[in-house]
């Protein structure tokens, strides 16, 4: 299990764009499970939508991608100052239910393919055991200029 201090060592994201609160499980190079506790204080709810706050789908995908980056960084020994994982693709994205304040977003990513610095993962996001989103996520480790 990784807490927020460990997450800070794994990815460069910080408030307000850090969308992972905890990693519950890392199963070697196969699978990772992380959570985001969604609160009304999340800044994206200010305009999406004031009368019925809903977490934007693209941010659900970003949260899954951040969990995937933590997974990949851990598989190779942690984050370094000169390298970062970047999102290279999203495929077969589906949104099934809204994510609202008070929900705990659970994200499970499974490694589909890994070749060199390239990763392809299947991401599934749930709330209370119900599917809210799914996507194939591709990412690549790159050197910072």
Provide a role label for each language-model segment.
Residues 1, 68-106, 132-134, 140:
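Hydrophobic beta-strand-centered segment that forms part of the acyl-chain substrate-binding groove
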Residues 2-14, 81-82:
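Short aromatic-glycine motifs in intrinsically disordered, low-complexity regions
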Residues 8, 51, 95-97:
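Beta-strand-rich interaction surfaces with strong enrichment in secreted/lumenal proteins
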Residues 15-55, 60:
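Catalytic strand-loop segment that frames the active site of acyl-thioester-processing enzymes
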Residues 19-22, 89, 94, 108-110, ...:
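Residues located in well-ordered beta-strands
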Residues 23, 64, 109, 129:
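A residue-level signal for conserved active-site and pocket-lining positions in enzyme catalytic cores
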Residues 28-29, 100-103, 110-145:
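HotDog/MaoC-like acyl-thioester-processing domains
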Residues 55-61, 65-72:
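Active-site- and interface-proximal helix/loop "cap" or "latch" segments in soluble metabolic
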């Amino acid at each position: 299990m990784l807490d927020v201090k460990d997450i800070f060592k794994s990815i460069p994201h910080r408030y307000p764009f850090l969308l992972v609160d905890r990693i519950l499980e890392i199963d070697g190079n196969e699978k990772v499970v992380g959570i985001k506790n969604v609160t009304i204080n999340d800044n994206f709810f200010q305009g999406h939508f004031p009368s019925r706050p809903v977490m934007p789908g693209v941010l659900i995908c970003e949260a899954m991608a951040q969990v995937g980056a933590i997974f990949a960084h851990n598989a190779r020994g942690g984050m370094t100052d000169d390298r970062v994982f970047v999102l290279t693709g999203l495929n077969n994205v589906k949104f099934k239910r809204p994510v609202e304040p008070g929900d705990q977003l659970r994200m499970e990513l499974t490694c589909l393919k890994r070749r060199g610095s390239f990763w392809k993962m299947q991401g599934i996001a749930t709330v209370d055991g119900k599917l809210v989103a799914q996507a194939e996520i591709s990412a690549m480790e790159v050197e910072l200029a």
